[in-house]
């Protein structure tokens, strides 16, 4: 199975930013134009771009949708979008605007009838965002931690038609401490579905370690801070992934 590197663009107040461990009080602005940043990642070889509406995640409804739709229309690679998407109308709006995959987090945990419906209608275009703290799912922009075990929830959602999960380890997001490879691989094996890793990637070796679990279903990694702080470039990451595949093949 191929392994996709997703450069992340987190949007707050119309700008490209990064938060530390999801803390809205610890923000770094990296670019005034998310669209220019998306084009930059495409120029460097991105095959997908990962977009997050941080204002939307906090407010519970899309807040930077116009910018996100413009990016989806303007770049030649697919985009996946998360942040504040909690209704069928919002999902349809993004899909009609050219977004390839919509990430649903809070609503998937809090409203299972809704989740059942959207997975039955658009399962291949939906990713379930599992944002976790110590293996428990967090919701509402990471402000609330539930008592729901990520693996148990994921297995239940697979019965409704879930095909793709995005696993974020909140304690590692933006910290550059390395991803939680064990939990990510365990989730992929427990569900038999595609799991994209998010949070903590700090060096190329982290990507290579995750990619060794591609055959288990770990299908990619979302990378943010490591790219923005020049820990490595997207081009370097993609070259290493290609080298891994030709070596493995």
Swiss-Prot record:
Keyword DNA damage: no
Pathway: Amino-acid biosynthesis; L-histidine biosynthesis; L-histidine from 5-phospho-alpha-D-ribose 1-diphosphate: step 4/9
Enzyme class: isomerase
Coarse class of the protein's main subcellular location: cytoplasm
Pfam families tied to this protein: His_biosynth
UniProt xrefs under InterPro entries: Aldolase_TIM, His_biosynth, HisA_bact_arch, Isoase_HisA-like, Isoase_HisA-like_bact, RibuloseP-bd_barrel
Protein name as annotated: 1-(5-phosphoribosyl)-5-[(5-phosphoribosylamino)methylideneamino] imidazole-4-carboxamide isomerase
Species name: Brevibacillus brevis (strain 47 / JCM 6285 / NBRC 100599)
Gene name in the database record: hisA
């Amino acid at each position: 199975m191929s392994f996709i590197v997703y450069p992340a663009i987190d949007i707050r107040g119309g700008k490209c930013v990064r938060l530390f461990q999801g803390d809205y009080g610890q923000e770094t602005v990296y670019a005034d134009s998310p669209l220019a940043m998306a084009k930059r990642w495409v120029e460097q070889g991105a095959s997908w771009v990962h977009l997050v509406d941080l204002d939307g995640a906090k407010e519970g409804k899309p807040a930077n949708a116009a910018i996100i739709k413009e990016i989806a229309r303007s770049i030649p690679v697919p985009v996946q979008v998360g942040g504040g998407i909690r209704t069928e109308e919002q999902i349809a709006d993004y899909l009609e605007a050219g977004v390839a995959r919509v990430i649903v987090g809070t609503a998937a945990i809090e409203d299972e009838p809704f989740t059942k419906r959207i997975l039955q209608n658009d399962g291949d275009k939906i990713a379930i965002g599992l944002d976790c703290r110590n293996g428990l799912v967090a919701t509402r922009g990471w402000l609330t931690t539930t008592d729901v075990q990520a693996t148990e929830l994921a297995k239940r959602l697979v019965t409704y038609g879930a095909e793709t999960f995005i696993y974020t380890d909140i304690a590692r997001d933006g910290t550059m401490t390395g991803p939680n490879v064990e939990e990510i691989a365990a989730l992929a094996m427990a569900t038999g579905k595609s799991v994209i890793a998010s949070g903590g990637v700090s060096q190329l070796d982290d990507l290579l370690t995750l990619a060794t679990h591609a055959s288990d279903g770990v299908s990619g990694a979302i990378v943010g801070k490591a790219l923005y702080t020049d820990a490595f470039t997207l081009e370097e990451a993609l070259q290493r992934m290609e080298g891994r595949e030709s070596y493995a093949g």
